[in-house]
């Protein structure tokens, strides 16, 4: 619903974003996410979330879009509020961290 930060992966050059999802469905819904952006993909707003999970406040309005909603690459907790991210390209940490992402959460 609300992409907050966006950047290119240093090795693959794919475009990635963090997303703060919608409110109003309880403390445990809807999970925020971190994902690569795919050309032509639909990520759900406002009809679905995290794949074909129909948004109850818009039930039955667009079953065609609900059915084709893309599941994000990394599902985070609800309301974690990732504010930024960076892909690590340094050599200070072990090699397994290289090209991985560090996510910055609010609070």
Predicted features, each with a name:
Residues 2-107:
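Beta-propeller domain segments
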């Amino acid at each position: 619903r609300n992409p907050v930060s966006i950047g290119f992966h240093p090795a693959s050059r794919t475009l990635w974003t963090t997303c703060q999802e919608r409110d109003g469905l309880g403390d445990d819904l809807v999970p925020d996410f971190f994902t690569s952006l795919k050309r032509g993909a639909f990520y759900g707003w406002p009809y679905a979330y995290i794949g074909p999970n129909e948004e109850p406040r818009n039930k039955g309005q667009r079953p065609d879009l609900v059915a084709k909603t893309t599941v994000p690459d990394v599902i985070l907790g609800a309301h974690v509020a990732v504010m930024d991210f960076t892909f690590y390209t340094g050599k200070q940490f072990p090699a397994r961290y290289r090209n991985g992402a560090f996510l910055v959460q609010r609070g």
